[in-house]
Design a protein with these regions (language model features):
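Phosphate-handling active-site elements
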Residues: 59-64, 92-102
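Generic structural marker for isolated residues within well-ordered, non-membrane alpha-helices
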Residues: 52, 88, 105
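Short, well-ordered alpha-helices that flank and scaffold nucleotide-derived cofactor binding pockets
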Residues: 54, 89, 93, 173
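N-terminal phosphate-binding loop and adjacent alpha-helix
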Residues: 40-57
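DPxDG-like acidic metal-binding loop motif
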Residues: 68-98
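Oxyanion-binding and handling regions
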Residues: 1-32, 41-46, 100-204
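Phosphate/pyrophosphate-binding loops at sites that engage ATP/ADP/AMP, CoA/4′-phosphopantetheine
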Residues: 52-68
Length: 204
């Protein structure tokens, strides 16, 4: 009976390690039924799978109950993003379910109506930003804080727990249509594009 409910509603696991945290959320239908986040500057690679397992166990579910995965693709910490993207690709392959990449910008923008600018902290006191307007999102940029247009509302990146839930919600909405494999979002000063690197090594 539980499996029938899961299949009808969809069970989506969203997770993110794009900054100094390891965060995950479990979405059943439209409800977040479990979530957890640990602040950590390093060690996400060793910590992530255990966190995901504990989250599923605590909610009374197993890996085979999942219908989709949502993974944060950044921007942010290079190593952290590759850890979660690699995990999502490996899990999607082994479970036979889609893995959907969601940027921190998209996740943060989920509950807001434009125009507004979302931002993620970047090195050297800079910010990764993306403008959302009625015409749609513009290309992400790397800017200094003084370059942000103060005439437009500015929304900092969501806190880790909220971010993981937003990633799961967006992944659930996209799960019914073909999606590209998740890839890290790297942003340079005048350029923004998903990584074209070879796929990271899949985690067992």
């Amino acid at each position: 009976m539980l499996s029938d409910v899961v299949q009808s509603q969809g069970l989506v696991l969203g997770f993110d390690t794009s900054a100094a945290h390891c965060a995950a959320a479990l979405l059943s239908g439209t409800n977040i039924i479990a979530h957890h986040a640990d602040n950590m500057a390093r060690g996400q690679g060793e910590h992530l799978m255990g966190l995901l397992q504990d989250l599923l166990d605590g909610a009374g579910h197993g890996w085979c109950d999942l219908t989709a995965l949502g993974v944060g693709i950044g921007p942010g910490n290079f190593t952290g993003i590759r850890i979660s993207v690699s995990a999502a690709r490996g899990l999607a392959l082994s479970l036979g379910i889609p893995a959907i990449g969601v940027s921190s910008f998209e996740a943060t923008a989920l509950a807001h109506i434009g125009p507004f600018t979302t931002s993620v902290p970047a090195p050297r006191e800079q910010l990764y930003t993306q403008l959302f307007s009625a015409e749609g999102p513009q290309a992400p940029r790397l800017v200094s804080a003084c370059e942000i247009d103060k005439r437009i509302p500015h929304i900092p990146c969501s806190a880790p727990l909220e971010l993981a839930g937003q990633i799961a919600q967006i992944a659930a909405k996209r799960a019914g249509t073909p999606q590209p494999r998740p890839a890290p979002l790297y942003i340079k000063a005048a350029d923004a594009a998903p990584s074209r690197d070879p796929a990271p090594t899949l985690l067992a």
